[in-house]
Regions:
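Loop-to-transmembrane-helix transition segments
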Residues: 6-16, 60-85, 155-163, 210-219
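Membrane-interface helix termini and inter-helical loops of multi-pass transporters
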Residues: 23-34, 59-61, 88-91, 140-153, ...
Length: 219
């Protein structure tokens, strides 16, 4: 299996993890406030990533300082902004609405790359975007027009749209940032920075006292 096929195979796992985050987050939010939950999630991920970075000897202080503006931006959009709106949105809308909105992200990322980064456009790309959007709608609604027509939009949906915008901005700028910093070091630094911002905001939720009582069992 060549490198390109391996990358495509790895990309197939992305929507799997995205989908799983909705179900787990919905359960977690019944016991822990949203920003506190996001802080724990990325705090744990950040610790693991720091260990991996040092294991692979990829730490480079000079590169981090040189690219700090880009790293700060992807941290604020991809970790902080996206997850604040994502977790808060789950408090006000259904996972169906949320997943439908977020699932359109690849379409808007592709359009943004074509419009702002001059990536090539072709009929094949256009058809792929249309088919992927139709596929998302069909899968989530189980092919029922009644389900699609009965969707109503509320405060939670607007929060998910804000999360979508953050995700698109992160995806478009992340590629540029990684030209100067390795993907692993970029992911580690943005996760750690994002966790710091989330932790600061979580203090206003007063939810850390509930963490010790968190249960993994269904209520």
């Amino acid at each position: 299996m060549n490198k390109i096929k391996s990358m495509h195979l790895m990309m197939l796992f992305v929507p799997l993890f995205w989908g799983g985050s909705f179900a787990t987050a919905e359960h977690v939010l019944t016991e822990i406030p949203p920003i506190t939950a996001a802080t724990i999630r990325f705090g744990l991920a950040g610790c693991i990533l720091i260990g991996i970075v040092f294991m692979k000897s990829e730490w480079n202080t000079s590169l981090l300082l040189k690219n700090w503006k880009g790293l700060l931006f992807v941290s604020l959009t991809g970790i902080f902004g996206y997850n604040v709106f994502f977790f808060m949105g789950l408090n006000y809308t259904s996972t169906l609405n949320g997943s439908l909105i977020i699932a359109t992200m690849p379409v808007f990322v592709t359009l943004g790359a074509i419009l702002f980064f001059k990536e090539s456009w072709s009929t094949k790309v256009g058809m792929s975007l249309i088919l992927s959007l139709i596929g998302v709608i069909v899968v989530i609604t189980s092919g029922s027009m009644d389900t699609l027509m009965s969707l109503s939009f509320n405060k939670g949906d607007l929060l998910f749209i804000a999360a979508l915008i953050c995700g698109v901005l992160y995806s478009l700028t992340g590629k540029k940032v990684m030209r100067g910093v390795s993907p692993l070091l970029t992911t580690m630094s943005m996760t750690v920075l994002g966790t710091v911002f989330l932790a600061g905001l979580s203090l206003y939720e007063d939810g850390w006292g509930k963490v010790g009582a968190f249960s993994l069992q269904d209520g």
